[in-house]
Amino acid sequence: MALAKRIIPCLDVDNGRVVKGVKFENIRDAGDPVEIARRYNEQGADEITFLDITASVDGRDTTLHTVERMASQVFIPLTVGGGVRTVQDIRNLLNAGADKVSINTAAVFNPEFVGEAADRFGSQCIVVAIDAKKVSAPGEAPRWEIFTHGGRKPTGLDAVEWAKKMEGLGAGEILLTSMDQDGMKNGFDLGVTRAISDALGIPVIASGGVGNLQHLADGILEGHASAVLAASIFHFGEYTVPEAKAYMAARGIVVR
């Protein structure tokens, strides 16, 4: 039987508030993370992802207190990321109630950290977040590069090769955000989503660009992702999680 595809609302948290921006800029406030997480839990979301978007840029640690409050209200898997740099950071987040921890910038500077984390805590709770931007010129074979620090710093790393390396080191899942599409609401970058999903044996979560329910389905059917992540379409009430699941089921996608 086909594995159910997951719908994951994403909470980008800045100084304790859920925010949403366009291409990581022009931030607008969407509310209290614990309240919002509780709403998605009640709506039947499969998981919730909480990203402290200030953490890596400011070198600040993810707010454990918010994670504790959220974990006490939410009974679906919770992935937390932002400023995760050490084994102790991961232990603190798991102890606070996170089910999975997302590593982004630190993986680029120290890839072995991913292997160490997977050995210590198990691959099932280690997610590597990849922020990719298309760098190939029109007419060239498509190529995507990894960026860090909230999409500000290029690394020169090829996104598909990097994802394969992360899988080899023990990552259990890849959270793939297209920097070109983030906040644009005109769909995932299906090219990079498909390239990475097809290259790996671990689940890939598509992120960046959802503006309607068709985009979610396209991420699965055309992007070959295992899960789809969205923020603003849920936060600002355009669609609910049950509406998204009904739409995807109608397109022939197995949902929980």
Curated annotation (Swiss-Prot):
Cysteine pairings via disulfide bonds: none
Metabolic or biological pathway, per its Swiss-Prot or TrEMBL entry: Amino-acid biosynthesis; L-histidine biosynthesis; L-histidine from 5-phospho-alpha-D-ribose 1-diphosphate: step 5/9
Any one Gene Ontology BP term: L-histidine biosynthetic process
Superkingdom classification of source: Bacteria
UniProt subcellular location: Cytoplasm
One annotated Gene Ontology cellular component of this protein: cytoplasm
GO molecular function: imidazoleglycerol-phosphate synthase activity; lyase activity
Active site: 12, 131
PANTHER family registered for this protein in UniProt: IMIDAZOLE GLYCEROL PHOSPHATE SYNTHASE HISHF (PTHR21235:SF2), IMIDAZOLE GLYCEROL PHOSPHATE SYNTHASE SUBUNIT HISF/H IGP SYNTHASE SUBUNIT HISF/H (PTHR21235)
HAMAP family in the record: HisF
Function noted in UniProt: IGPS catalyzes the conversion of PRFAR and glutamine to IGP, AICAR and glutamate. The HisF subunit catalyzes the cyclization activity that produces IGP and AICAR from PRFAR using the ammonia provided by the HisH subunit.
Record text on subunit structure and interactions: Heterodimer of HisH and HisF.
UniProt similarity note: Belongs to the HisA/HisF family.
Protein name, UniProt field: Imidazole glycerol phosphate synthase subunit HisF
Naturally occurring in which organism (per UniProt): Pseudomonas putida (strain W619)
Lineage start: Bacteria, Pseudomonadati, Pseudomonadota, Gammaproteobacteria, Pseudomonadales
Encoding gene (name): hisF
